[in-house]
């Protein structure tokens, strides 16, 4: 019994190590992105901040899908219910992509309006306008990462999650 408890603790810390390193990769990319924007001047830093805020709003909603993925994937995987796991993952992707398309539409229709809610500086909003399409497509491009993050954590298969994040970080810097 002691060995099984010890093995469970070791697995717990290995999973958390992978999540910690994944989060560290995300922080490194965000730090670099902010630093690169700052080196281009105050205007570009302000533009990046506005556009990243749109991503942050979307990410709060998508974290709900990630949390659901963690809980439900873990539940069905732990119970050995492959059908329940399959249905859960399929539903997460269906509803996740639906929400991503909704956010993309909202950002495309009301993008500059949202930017004006975040700042009263018209020059910053105008400088952000050419980059707004990138922010509009982030939900559709990023939804898979949020859902898989939750599923990988729920399955305690965090090595694959860490590997994909490291590869994405490497590609970002290339």
What are the residue ranges of the model-derived segments?
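Short alpha-helical transmembrane segments in multi-pass integral membrane proteins
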Residues: 1-16, 20, 73-138
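Hydrophobic/aromatic residues in alpha-helical transmembrane segments
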Residues: 17, 29, 33, 69, ...
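Alpha-helical membrane-inserting segments
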Residues: 25, 29, 33, 37, ...
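Helix-terminus/linker motif at the lipid-water interface of multi-pass membrane proteins
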Residues: 27-57, 75-76, 113-122
């Amino acid at each position: 019994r002691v060995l099984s408890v010890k093995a469970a603790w070791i697995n717990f810390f290995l999973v958390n190590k992978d999540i910690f390193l994944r989060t560290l990769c995300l922080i490194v990319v965000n730090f670099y992105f902010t630093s690169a924007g700052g080196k281009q001047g105050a205007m570009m830093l302000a533009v990046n901040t506005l556009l990243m805020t749109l991503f942050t709003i979307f990410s709060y909603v998508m974290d709900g899908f990630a949390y659901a993925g963690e809980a439900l994937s873990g539940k069905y995987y732990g119970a050995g219910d492959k059908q329940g796991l399959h249905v859960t993952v399929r539903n997460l992707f269906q509803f996740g992509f639906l929400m991503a398309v909704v956010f993309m539409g909202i950002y495309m229709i009301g993008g500059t309006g949202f930017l004006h809610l975040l700042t009263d500086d018209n020059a910053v909003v105008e400088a952000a306008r050419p980059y707004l399409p990138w922010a509009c497509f982030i939900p559709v491009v990023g939804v898979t990462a949020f859902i898989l993050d939750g599923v990988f954590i729920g399955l305690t298969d965090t090595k694959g999650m860490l590997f994909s994040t490291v590869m994405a970080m490497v590609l970002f810097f290339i």
